[in-house]
Amino acid sequence: MGTLVLSEVLANADKYDEYLDVYVADDRDPVPESEVELVDYEGPHTPKPPGKRCLLGIDDIRIVLDTWSKWRGGRTPSDAERCEAVAFYAKYDSYLPVE
């Protein structure tokens, strides 16, 4: 699959299998340019990628981004806004409020 970056995965979340988890580096906050790894949590046991943590599953990412857009009148988020919304949800288990 090659190197994946968070902005590409978030922008194309509808194209990925819903049973994939998105892993990011343990030691930093996710940004659009973050390299990610996708792990199928429905397949055979796959160990956590070393030095990475699960950000969210693709199924949850789709819901977060759909909610972000609905709360903002159907607007399409930028790469930075997608990343912010997903990181916020992953950290607080809550949708990013409208400012």
Which stretches of residues belong to each language-model region?
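Extended, charge-biased low-complexity segments
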Residues: M1-P47
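Amphipathic protein-protein interaction modules
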Residues: S34-S94, V98
